[in-house]
Amino acid sequence: MVQQRGARAKRDGGPPPPGPGPAAEGAREPGWCKTPSGHIKRPMNAFMVWSQHERRKIMDQWPDMHNAEISKRLGRRWQLLQDSEKIPFVREAERLRLKHMADYPDYKYRPRKKSKGAPAKARPRPPGGGGGGSRLKPGPQLPGRGGRRASGGPLGGGAAAPEDDDEDEEEELLEVRLLETPGRELWRMVPAGRAARGPAERAQGPSGEGAAASAASPTLSEDEEPEEEEEEAATAEEGEEETVVSGEEPLGFLSRMPPGPAGLDCSALDRDPDLLPPSGTSHFEFPDYCTPEVTEMIAGDWRSSSIADLVFTY
């Protein structure tokens, strides 16, 4: 019957009428959706029913054409078809779906999972352990707190940790302290713990500064180096005019200033202003719009002998 339809179509010169084709012939077989491995295939849809015949035609015309290119052309042609032309193939796909359900009632679509390739093998590490040159090498340890903690054990011993904490607290609390030098006096921010160790150190002169520094040096931590002391001294010299001074130390600072030309000369402030040469107008000269009473009061004697003279009578 199918061959007769195809022969009639060839004689008429038109396309063969849509019929069941190979899909219907395969449906008559008992295992028409089973593969040799036992896998049950999905029922074909309308496009698959239509593309079976069209694919064969393209393969006959262009046998060297790639399968992907054939699929692209079939997809474009299917989209160009009108809905009325797709109706026969839609009906055939529905019939195949119902037959598939009758033959395989327990069928459930389970798409195959894409097999992931084996994970790439880890690169062999060079002998010697570690990550090679990617890891940073530990630098030389400075002789400071780290060295003291390492010598005391993994945690620096029992008394090393409290001692370090005390030193940190002393460095956080700062206090203004006067440093006396041979030709100059300046203010410096020093740790409060060091300033409180001896109040007598502030009263020492230039000669006692070296002795005070030598006496305080054993109590300082081992990690403080001379370079840090030089930097602190330089910083104190730069900011000597900006530091804030509190307490009684400013009074002592003024009392220890040597008298002389460098000191403050207050004698110029005690001079009588009447003895100064007149320069321009005085601040006691008022314009002409002053009242006679005000002019008389200004011209009169300010140093009255009694309070009664200052009372005005109108």
From Swiss-Prot:
Residues 191-217 have a biased composition (Low complexity). GO terms for molecular function: DNA binding; DNA-binding transcription activator activity, RNA polymerase II-specific; transcription cis-regulatory region binding. Its main location: nucleus. It holds the Pfam family HMG_box. Residues 162-173, 221-243 have a biased composition (Acidic residues). Residues 174-187 have a biased composition (Basic and acidic residues). Residues 149-159 have a biased composition (Gly residues). One of its GO terms (cellular component) is protein-DNA complex. GO terms for biological process: positive regulation of regulatory T cell differentiation; positive regulation of transcription by RNA polymerase II; spinal cord development. Keywords: Activator, DNA-binding, Nucleus, Transcription, Transcription regulation. Induction: Induced by T-cell receptor signaling in naive CD4-positive T-cells and in splenic and thymic regulatory T-cells. Up-regulated in splenic T reg cells by dextran sulfate sodium (DSS)-induced colitis. It is found in: Nucleus. Residues 40-108 bind DNA. Disruption phenotype: Knockout mice are viable, fertile and morphologically normal. Increased expression of Sox11 in brain and cartilage at 14.5 dpc, with increased expression in liver and kidney at 16.5 dpc. Increased expression of Sox4 in spinal cord and cartilage at 14.5 dpc, with increased expression in liver at 16.5 dpc. Sox12 knockout naive CD4-positive T cells fail to differentiate into pT reg cells in mice with dextran sulfate sodium (DSS)-induced colitis. Sox4, Sox11, and Sox12 triple knockout mice are embryonically lethal and show severe thinning and undulation of the neural tube. Transcription factor that binds to DNA at the consensus sequence 5'-ACCAAAG-3'. Acts as a transcriptional activator. Binds cooperatively with POU3F2/BRN2 or POU3F1/OCT6 to gene promoters, which enhances transcriptional activation. Involved in the differentiation of naive CD4-positive T-cells into peripherally induced regulatory T (pT reg) cells under inflammatory conditions. Binds to the promoter region of the FOXP3 gene and promotes its transcription, and might thereby contribute to pT reg cell differentiation in the spleen and lymph nodes during inflammation. Residues 1-40, 101-287 are annotated as: Disordered. The gene is Sox12. Residues 282-314 are annotated as: Required for transcriptional activation activity and synergistic coactivation of transcriptional activity with POU3F2. Expressed in splenic and thymic regulatory T-cells (at protein level). Expressed in embryonic molar and incisor teeth. This is Transcription factor SOX-12.
